[in-house]
Design a protein with these regions (language model features):
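Bacterial N-terminal signal peptides that target proteins for export
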Residues: 1-8
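Hydrophobic alpha-helix-in-membranes signature
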Residues: 4, 37-40, 120-122, 193, ...
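Residues that define the transmembrane beta-barrel architecture of outer-membrane proteins
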Residues: 28-30, 63-67, 114-120, 134, ...
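Flexible, solvent-exposed loop segments that connect beta-strands
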Residues: 44-60, 92-115, 148-168, 204-224
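Gram-negative (and chloroplast) outer-membrane scaffold detector with strong preference
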Residues: 74-153, 184, 233-236, 240
């Protein structure tokens, strides 16, 4: 986890970049579009499954496939460079599996939960033209993330009680992507690519109680586990044709 000074510096720099981008929105061609992406958890950078142990039980906490969708805007700065921003709805999903080894009582249980955030990405895209209609691009950028309130859930047999609280209400993350897009002046832009997203700091602090003697009986109280929420996604995007945007204007 990054130090507090670096965290605040990153947030301030990202807000400044957003302000500059908004102030320059009248420069260059703009197109608007939509995106839909599955979020695939990755085990790198400290985001792998967590094995939690207590006196009479243990719990494995890991990520599941989530999803993301939203609206995007591209602002062309030159033939090969474009800025892309937008607003996204993001849902990360997690699962937990628990077992107990209490004498005279043995049980296992499973459960899951989801966590929502709203993201404001800002990415710089560099294009390489492969043919008249096909372009490859790579991008690097950052994202401003706003997190929802705490979430709670219970396992399928009520042995495990879960509670997750947000580590902070605002956070930042780093994005990098590569992809291909097909452009048609009358139909629009179709894009498929992949992206990795790495939050700069913990997004969730997760707590468990395992009722190893049965629901409502004695329980193991787990210390908070810190979740990073890194993910890899397959990006699908569609942008309206520039001619349609010019007609609206």
């Amino acid at each position: 986890m990054v130090s507090k000074p670096l965290y605040y510096l990153f947030i301030v720099l990202l807000l400044t970049c957003y302000g500059q981008t908004i102030s320059q929105n009248n420069e260059g061609d703009k197109i608007f579009g939509f995106t839909l992406s599955p979020l695939i958890p990755i085990d790198y950078f400290g985001a792998g499954p967590l094995i939690l142990e207590n006196n009479y039980s243990n719990i494995e906490l890991s990520s599941k496939i989530g999803y993301q969708f939203g609206m995007l805007m591209r602002n062309t700065k030159s033939k090969n460079i474009t800025l892309e921003s937008g607003i996204l709805f993001c849902r990360r999903n997690f699962k937990f599996i628990g077992e107990n080894n209490f004498i005279g009582s043995s049980n296992s249980d499973v459960g899951d939960f989801g966590y929502i955030n709203y993201a404001f990405p800002l990415n710089a895209l560099v294009f390489i033209q492969l043919s008249d209609n096909v372009h490859m691009n790579t991008s690097l950028g950052a994202e401003l993330d706003f997190y929802a309130s705490a979430v709670a859930s219970k396992s399928s047999q009520n042995f495990i009680h879960h509670y997750s609280e947000r580590a902070r209400w605002i956070n930042g993350s780093v994005n990098a992507s590569i992809g291909l897009e097909f452009r048609d002046k009358d139909v629009g832009v179709f894009y498929i690519g992949s992206q990795v997203n790495i939050p700069i700091s913990t997004i969730l602090v997760t707590h468990f109680k395992y009722y190893y003697a049965g629901s409502g009986g004695d329980f193991d109280d787990y210390e908070g586990a810190f979740l990073r929420g890194n993910y890899f996604n397959i990006q699908l995007k569609y942008f309206l044709p520039l001619s349609m945007e010019n007609t609206k204007n």
